[in-house]
Amino acid sequence: MVKRQTDTIFALSTAQGKSGVAVIRISGPSSMEALRLLGVKDDISPRVAHCRLLHDSKGRLIDQAVVLYFPKPGSFTGEDVVELQVHGSRAVIRLLYEELQTFIRIAEPGEFSLRAYLNGKIDLTRAEGIADLINAETDAQLRQALAQSTGKLEKQYDQWRSILLDILTDLEACIDFPEDVDSSCVLGGIYNNIEKLCAVLGQYLNDGHRGERLRSGVRVVILGPPNAGKSTLFNSIARRNAAIVSEHPGTTRDVLEVAIDIGGYPYIVLDTAGIRESCDGIEQEGIKRAKMAAEEADIKIVMYPYETTSMQGIDPICDLQDEKTILVLSKADNVDLPESKCIDGKEFHLISVHQDRGIGKLLTLIQEKSRDSFPQEGDVFITSQRHRSHLQKALQVVDAVSKVMPIEIVAEHLRIAAYELGRVTGAVSGDDILDDIFSKFCIGK
């Protein structure tokens, strides 16, 4: 995909399906010729909305459209761009696609954003931020995506790379012009700056993966013995019948998950098989998967029936003392009791799904337990494993620098670190990286 940048492309930039308005974007050197193909013969002023009739090759009317023209380089892609705002009818879209495909080609996923990157309109972190913005489902995800798509990460990473390149410039002056430079003084400053940068990068990487967790959601697993009410709670949180509920123990065999929004933050809630001793092979596999889900979860909700009076002789399922574990007694129906109950020195939260009691408090507890799992608003955090990998490599090579190294070797370490930081923003890149990033975009972006 990276190599084909001289032709003209088009795609639907709005969602598929019926809608009041649909936008078709055209980008490339033949954008205006494509518009002429649709019967628009008069001049179109840049950045001015024009109402025009679009026709097929036989002169038959397709639709009345609002036409916008953005000449290069002042467009999103940096190329000549035409946007057609038409009625969101499947028939209209199909006819326009049929006409345009005779002259230009359909864009590949993410190709508009790729061209924007290749033409210097955005860096890779901004491009990834655009993808996150499109996929954002909660307020917090939206805020993080907006910060990234408007250049906060780019500014941070470029600043660190600039520091490295400045250090490298001073170091190369010592190498190339030793007679003109007070090497001992300059090298002292260089090593001091390297040490400071290592500390900053190390602190930045030691972030608890908050940025990535905000993208993917905090994982909350519901655990407990069979018939503890796990699936009933799961359905209540999901606000739909996502899991089968039955009086027969062992109904849930596989791990089910649903994405929810709690207070503007993303969570993935998982329902699991009841954990008990079983000779049934399928149930054993479900129990195995439940335990694996527990190991990977950020928060565990451990449920027991309300009738439970002691934990003695009961398989604890997981570490009940873990600060990320919430203990719950379910089926507390028709009982006039406080919100919690103490059993063997452990506090259990009481819920009744059927009477809608305690669910709101449980969601509040989940929020409190996950408060430090998300970045604070305004913070600039690592948002993907790709970023983290390059930053870790940069820190690794810079941290390996020592004063006993020949300065030529130190310079090479700094070059590698600058290269790794450049890979994050795309200041240096390879086709494999670009294809991997932009292929995850939707067609019209």
UniProtKB/Swiss-Prot annotation:
Binds 1 potassium ion per subunit. GO terms for cellular component: cytoplasm. Residues 217-371 form the TrmE-type G domain. It comes from the Bacteria. Pfam families: MMR_HSR1 (PF01926), MnmE_helical (PF12631), TrmE_N (PF10396). Keywords: Cytoplasm, GTP-binding, Hydrolase, Magnesium, Metal-binding, Nucleotide-binding, Potassium, tRNA processing. The keyword Transmembrane helix does not apply. Gene3D superfamilies: P-loop containing nucleotide triphosphate hydrolases, Probable tRNA modification gtpase trme, domain 1, tRNA modification GTPase MnmE domain 2. Exhibits a very high intrinsic GTPase hydrolysis rate. Involved in the addition of a carboxymethylaminomethyl (cmnm) group at the wobble position (U34) of certain tRNAs, forming tRNA-cmnm(5)s(2)U34. This is tRNA modification GTPase MnmE. It comes from Anaplasma phagocytophilum (strain HZ). The gene is mnmE.
